[in-house]
UniProtKB/Swiss-Prot annotation:
Family that this chain belongs to: Belongs to the adaptor complexes large subunit family.
Protein name per UniProt: Beta-adaptin-like protein B
Cysteine pairs bridged by disulfides in the record: none
Gene coding for it: BETAB-AD
InterPro entries: AP_beta, AP_complex_bsu_1_2_4, ARM-like, ARM-type_fold, B-adaptin_app_sub_C, Clathrin/coatomer_adapt-like_N, Clathrin_a/b/g-adaptin_app_Ig, Clathrin_app_Ig-like_sf
Mode of membrane association: Peripheral membrane protein
Protein source organism: Arabidopsis thaliana (Mouse-ear cress)
Keywords assigned by UniProt, alphabetized: Cytoplasmic vesicle, Golgi apparatus, Membrane, Protein transport, Transport
Subunit structure: Adaptor protein complexes are heterotetramers composed of two large adaptins (beta-type subunit and alpha-type or delta-type or epsilon-type or gamma-type subunit), a medium adaptin (mu-type subunit) and a small adaptin (sigma-type subunit).
Pfam family, one: Alpha_adaptinC2
Location in the cell: Golgi apparatus; Golgi apparatus, trans-Golgi network; Cytoplasmic vesicle, Clathrin-coated vesicle membrane
Amino acid sequence: MSGHDSKYFSTTKKGEIPELKEELNSQYKDKRKDAVKKVIAAMTVGKDVSSLFTDVVNCMQTENLELKKLVYLYLINYAKSQPDLAILAVNTFVKDSQDPNPLIRALAVRTMGCIRVDKITEYLCDPLQKCLKDDDPYVRKTAAICVAKLFDINAELVEDRGFLEALKDLISDNNPMVVANAVAALAEIQENSSSPIFEINSTTLTKLLTALNECTEWGQVFILDALSKYKAADPREAENIVERVTPRLQHANCAVVLSAVKMILQQMELITSTDVIRNLCKKMAPPLVTLLSAEPEIQYVALRNINLIVQKRPTILAHEIKVFFCKYNDPIYVKMEKLEIMIKLASDRNIDQVLLEFKEYATEVDVDFVRKAVRAIGRCAIKLERAAERCISVLLELIKIKVNYVVQEAIIVIKDIFRRYPNTYESIIATLCESLDTLDEPEAKASMIWIIGEYAERIDNADELLESFLENFPEEPAQVQLQLLTATVKLFLKKPTEGPQQMIQVVLNNATVETDNPDLRDRAYIYWRLLSTDPEAAKDVVLAEKPVISDDSNQLDPSLLDELLTNISTLSSVYHKPPEAFVTRLKTTVQKTEDEDFAEGSEAGYSSSNPVDSAASPPGNIPQPSGRQPAPAVPAPVPDLLGDLMGLDNAAIVPVDDPITQSGPPLPVVVPASSGQGLQISAQLSRKDGQVFYSMLFENNSQSVLDGFMIQFNKNTFGLAAAGSLQIPPLHPATSARTMLPMVLFQNMSAGPPSSLLQVAVKNNQQPVWYFTDKIILHALFGEDGRMERGTFLETWRSLPDSNEVLKEFPGITITSVESTIELLTAFNMFFIAKRKNGNQDVIYLSAKDPRDVPFLIELTAMVGQPGLKCAVKTPTPEIAPLFFEALELLFKA
């Protein structure tokens, strides 16, 4: 619709639908075209015009391309709600796919691919096969994308009808845009498939590199992304690939530049020549710098990616730090990212320039930016030992400005500097103490208290300074209370005089009697008993030499960094999280959460929680109150350990909890307290005595009593559901309860490919429903009867076709010994069959059996003590193999 068609969006009078129906059936072409435009306009603004489906479909029989496009647009929107009527359009689609006009042929196959109705996919196959071999490249490139859409609707159909092979053939097409679309489609299919579909070999590589020079910019992005996954055979091949890709660094499109950088970084891992690497680093710097002259939004994406790049290859931009200096009109989100990169690029050579910039930023008006700038100075001091003194000088100058939030942030970072360089810069403590009265932020107070406690022997009036903080001890945040407690103990141990002795009595009394905070209370009791039992031992513990903190500017784990670098120019590189942390793969994990699955406000489907007598609880689902709740039984009296030391009263000591309540391994947090209104839920599937359980820990950090707990599990691959009700007693504030909920299998199974996704809903009487996602760990489902005889194992292995064998490598896993590996896997019902040597590698064979008695034949290959584990699984259900690999990796990394 053109710009002149805005009149169709104007509000129409009552009785619009009958009038449109009449116009759609008019004998005049122009009137029908205007009517379809009105229908599309109404549909666009949200009006329901589905009742006109048959009338609009009748308008498909036209030679007018514009009208045909509009009708197709209507069909895409309403075919899902009217699947039976959509079949009426099939004959026209098939006819249009054979039209002499290539635009109409492409339009027909594109529209059929967009209509996500199973009944239509059967009719799509024949036209699609013809279009994949069409003489016109425009039709072929459209058909290539349609294969990916069809795979998303019906993967089995795509494989059975040979569309994947046809798609691979298009990589050899003489038209670069067809090649690019074929690559894009294959890459999309590979993302949603567990088996290898798109593998680049040397022949394919040459074709892709040739097409790279001739296709459009977005085609180049698809090809570069595919090439970044190719592993060169040797350094020479890697150099040749990089040489062909390097010209893309000069491209005007930012996406092409970042994809080229990603591809070059991946190949650089294989290049051994230092000269070649040095030259590549020089070539990558200018295009990355150019990205920073784009719009702020693009700058932000570029900066997030550059942040990753400089962590891996800091030499690329080591001489370009000035381009990251903040401009006065930069948005705050750009300034923050520039600060991060400046810290990473700071060196002894450029630190003076960097400190001048940071000092300038610390005088700006944006409080968050100022805080970040002050903290950046401290991080540079920790990173660069030679520059630490200059950094401290700048911080002291900022303290003299007497701006409250600047002073407080400076004290926080100086505490970290003292940790990094103990007994070096303590001469500035007097200056810091001048600002005591202005401190009102918990972190700044805690930092100042730590400094006073740590250097109490060098501060003459340390007891007076701490006493000034103690006046408001009960009202202080937990962070400050904990630091005050420790600092007072340090002061007493360093200066065991009357003043500190009285202070510690007050603090310990407040921390054990007057507080509801379990962390504070527990720490106070630890100190209390340490001091009363053996003050010398207390000195060894409390005044022990602390580990020196290290530079935190490269905060990402190396394995995570490598994964993020393979995802440069994607959302993953902006979030700095791996894709699986925030994306569920559409084909494998997205499941419906309709009203019948998780009914908001309805208790149907939930397993309820009732406060019942423990004797009546089902076996294995017994609530276990944790140590956060005082145990009812009073233990043997605690000896008066403090009486002879300070004459303190021991009567206030809370009974030590029964250790049985602390049993069980720590569970992963699935609902943190911060997002659960104070309720924290930890959970994981487990197995005990042949029964599958859902182990759960509920912790109430809110101020209310929580009761009436209920749980519901969504449809899932294995049909896991609760076997009984959830037995959780009313949770009072600062208490917790652990339970093991028995589970049953194959009750509520989901359709579609296997997935480890477990969607859970938990509710109680006081809060809204909490939805969370957990993992089905396959080894929790393996049966105790999975052991095979060696002969049976060999016979089963040979009887299964090679296509049922799935391989995966785990480069980050190291086997320390064969025996410990066998012991670990046997504990999770993966039973040892045999082992052998293959050169300097050990090969272990194991067997397991899933709940449906489907065998898993496992072959593990690794070199003891060296990173890298190869796993082959042969099973009648190879589609489950990815879930097995996921569980195996979890076991080895636990």
